[in-house]
Amino acid sequence: MVDLIVGLQWGDEGKGKIVDLVAKNYDIVIRSQGGHNAGHTVVVDGKKYALHLLPSGVLNPNATNVIGNGVVVYPKQLIKEIRSFEHNIKEKLLISDKAHMILDHHIAIDQAREKLRGKNAIGTTGRGIGPAYADKIARVGVRMGELRNIPKLIEKLVHYYEMNKGYFDYLGIEIPSISKLEEELKEYKQELGSLITNTTQYLWDNMDKNMLLEGAQATLLDIDHGTYPYVTSSNTIASGALTGSGIAPKNLNKVIGIAKAYATRVGNGPFPTEDDGKAGDKIREQGGEYGTTTGRPRRCGWFDVVAARYAVTLNGCDEVAVMKLDVLDGFDKVKVCVGYEIDGEKIDYFPSELDDVKPVYVELDGWDGSVHVTKWEDLPKNAQKYIEFIEEKIGTKIKYVSTGAERNATVIR
């Protein structure tokens, strides 16, 4: 049985908490796409864990964690994360030999190109994700399994650098020496080599077990279905998770969509419900809305039903979790976007271009006292009405309501 968790907004929805909450029900937790640009924070027993590449299942001692073929792996970051744990998590970690590797030149390219874009900057995290995926598509990328034969890999990379010397010179990027390259690759092999395997076959061999596919980033950042070009470089929707793991669609049991009780976005790109006034500032401060990966303040605004319904439909969600409801405590009124207006015309669907979209809002009464509530009946009545309103508009059951950072601060309906 395979369940899947996917973000419904622009990322940072709190997927890690729900994965951590339900991971005890799963034998295998799989990360299927993205790279260390994805950051999620999980709080357990008061201790905060910031994960970028590792699946959230690492906090469950009984789960095997898989980094799938669709992930782009920066070995330095992965080694750093593994070492940050007091106990040995390697015994329960597998890395796909087909997952592509981010090398330092990918990061240098990413940062140099973003700088050259000037005012047209996309807002990339500068972690080398796009260039690594670009090399994958161009069929010149490096896969984790190639660490098994370092001399052959070095030969391949030397040829790559020779072919791209003009481009590197244009961007002002220094090509690493062979000795430095060899030293780094040997360290990667020493630290990670024993974990690299055919994870697709492993998953096929264990289809009788309970599995959880954990998406990174979120629907509105999908390379095809998101707010292009202000998107990530992979398919972040449910179908992308299947491609990034090798799991067949027929094996999928349930899709759980994750959304905040409001909306946030990091970096550039359209954001119809953004509030750059006092309300947005209050949400940011009460919600601690600063990027796990970059530390950048997130842009904040109101819940967007149109975007959420679009995401729920794209992913085929069976149920939804609404996160950080407690952040909206203390507002006299809360807004919900129920439609868009473009050139005076009202629409209720998510268009491919959002630049000229204006939100159409309804206002609901606010509430106080939702923090750390664990039972539906204990939530303030107006908070209940808020959840029920969103549930009706998106047409999918809201099963989980998060009321705090701790794992147990969750209402399960």
Curated annotation (Swiss-Prot):
Keywords: Cytoplasm, GTP-binding, Ligase, Magnesium, Metal-binding, Nucleotide-binding, Purine biosynthesis. It is found in: Cytoplasm. InterPro entries: Adenylosuccin_syn_GTP-bd, Adenylosuccin_syn_Lys_AS, Adenylosuccinate_synth_dom1, Adenylosuccinate_synth_dom2, Adenylosuccinate_synth_dom3, Adenylosuccinate_synthetase, P-loop_NTPase. Its main location: cytoplasm. IMP binds at residues 12-15, 37-40, 125, 139, 217, 232, 296. It is an enzyme of class 6 (ligase). One of its GO terms (biological process) is 'de novo' AMP biosynthetic process. Substrate binds at residues 292-298. Its cofactor is Mg(2+). GO terms for cellular component: cytoplasm. Pathway: Purine metabolism; AMP biosynthesis via de novo pathway; AMP from IMP: step 1/2. It catalyses: IMP + L-aspartate + GTP = N(6)-(1,2-dicarboxyethyl)-AMP + GDP + phosphate + 2 H(+). The keyword Nucleotide-binding applies. Gene3D superfamilies: Adenylosuccinate Synthetase, subunit A, domain 1 (3.40.440.10), Adenylosuccinate Synthetase, subunit A, domain 2 (1.10.300.10), Adenylosuccinate Synthetase, subunit A, domain 3 (3.90.170.10). Its EC number is 6.3.4.4. The active site is at residues 12, 40. Mg(2+) binds at residues 12, 39. Binds 1 Mg(2+) ion per subunit. GTP binds at residues 11-17, 39-41, 298, 324-326, 402-404. HAMAP family: Adenylosucc_synth. Homodimer. Plays an important role in the de novo pathway of purine nucleotide biosynthesis. Catalyzes the first committed step in the biosynthesis of AMP from IMP. PANTHER family: ADENYLOSUCCINATE SYNTHETASE. This is Adenylosuccinate synthetase. It comes from Nautilia profundicola (strain ATCC BAA-1463 / DSM 18972 / AmH).
